[in-house]
């Protein structure tokens, strides 16, 4: 399997990576060497005979190399396949910029294989250049100049390469509203100047196939007429997609492919087609008919990502020749489209030849190393060691700038498989160049153990040995094929080793031997696996102070629960069986109002730690025990002579006590003062009752009634006196006013009410005579 050694740099990187990954081996239910190798890059398998003891699982054979060596497995018995890379050069000759041309990888899951790819930029590499021009009306001056540039463009290419070809295509936009005016007259002549001869709008027209004939270029371009549309953005991405998707129609060779995109405005992209009721996404296929993109009104514009993928797939490098106001817009576009460049185009395109030369030099001096699409099970990273001293590590693609002619640069490619893969291959290429590296990937998952299949005695003659373990014949099972199934299926035997249908065989911690679980021995010190289904062990219990069940001195673990030794208790035997910390000064546990657990009181509701003596939030007992105080001291009240039964928790004291002072009314309405001193326990008090009661005499009913009647009468008399006084004052005031008016009046002999019956009238004419 091994051929040429991989380069030293790749080998060093691979070994250093392997050292890191080999420090651990995470495994689960491993029963073969292949399953062990698939568990991780740090796992190795011991094929030594009798390496496992009675009850040991086969998974004991799978561990890190240091662990297996420590357990007595010889180095020759350890199976540890590694990922390898074999390189093969192409000896067919020809100018190759990438080497090697073929690499074969043998990949172990989780372990990378590394190899080097060298790129050497060649001088005079063949070039195909396709000039794609915007023919909207604003590009009128540019079209005039481009018609004269055929010879200049080809001469510029010949300065760079000995084999250059040029082609030409043009675009405007989709021929539906709102992109163009769909009035019949405007469709025939979309230009604002009616006297100007214009061609109808179109999405994309392939004018000239790639050729080295500059006269033909000049002739065909000279026939082109300007056109027009409505909105500012153009349908340039539509045209670029067709140029990339139609290699045969365009005439692309397998050489450096340049696409010059000349415009003075922006571009429509995916989703804009909805404005014209075009809902079908762009399919990225060639739809040229008679050199026209006639189905442009059926498909939406392509997305930028879709176009970038198509350009990279066909190894086309776009050069955006745009006017000054659009430079920033297209610079943003080049960040998404790899291996692309932007040049500032003069208003009349007079500098296009110089622009193309500069852009080509910029593109060819930067190298991107990338690969085609891969399944999720393969991961590829690149380390770039550029000639200018710059290094990029662990990148999704290789990237070097400032690459000079005939100066080699190196990329280290690391490929990792996440699982055992099927045989497959992928291609690595330098974007914009035609050379490729074919990488064939093979799985490295099998163990090449010593062939002992003929020695059947080690398996009781009922099987053969494979990598240290027996593979039994039909009808026999067991570690050494010692168990005969006797017609029972393996499923039936395994069913006896399951707790229920949803559980795994022997809880995953034992082997099912002849229908019975043989529990594994554990690598963990002190762990014993047992039980009918190996469901129990001596370690999976609660811990205290970092030890199972508080340590051997406190208790032992039995099937998930701690059994504590005498003197200890608790779910993890964390508590000592003593109540010293719970005793009050009277040596009563938690004052009779709680429970002592782990030498700490757990008080009844409301009572406070540490000894459950106080209950700040509890209701006052005064009102509850007034009847008891009355019967204990005075032998009165509702309890009467049945006081001892009604008040069992109270004890009468003849001497004053300390505690809660109460003052309540008894059944006779007298105030009784007493003091309650709480004793140990619930509702237990020592009570001292004051002998004197404050009894209030009954009310004098006659005095109350007489006083009430007298008060009402007096109030009535007082109101009458006040009313009479007010009437008198009002009459007095009226009389005095009458007296004043009488003094002011003057009387004569004439009756002021009499009117004379005689009326005298003077004749005015009498005086004139």
UniProtKB/Swiss-Prot annotation:
Annotated positions of the Phosphoserine modification: 745, 756
Pyrrolidone carboxylic acid found at: 23
Subcellular location, record wording: Cell membrane; Membrane raft
All ranges on the Extracellular side of the membrane: 23-700
Annotated SUPFAM superfamilies: EGF/Laminin, Integrin beta tail domain, Integrin domains, Plexin repeat, vWA-like
Phosphothreonine, modified sites: 758-760
Residues the record lists as binding Ca(2+) 2: 173, 229, 231, 233-234
Gene Ontology BP terms: amyloid-beta clearance; apoptotic process; cell adhesion; cell adhesion mediated by integrin; cell-cell adhesion; cell-cell adhesion via plasma-membrane adhesion molecules; cell-cell signaling; cell-matrix adhesion
Disulfide bonds: 25-43, 33-447, 36-62, 46-73, 191-198, 246-286, 386-400, 420-445, 449-467, 459-470, 472-481, 483-514, 497-512, 506-517, 519-534, 536-559, 541-557, 549-562, 564-573, 575-598, 582-596, 590-601, 603-612, 615-618, 622-662, 628-647, 631-643, 670-695
Coiled-coil positions: none
Major subcellular location class: membrane
Record family assignment: Belongs to the integrin beta chain family.
The protein's name: Integrin beta-2
Organism: Homo sapiens (Human)
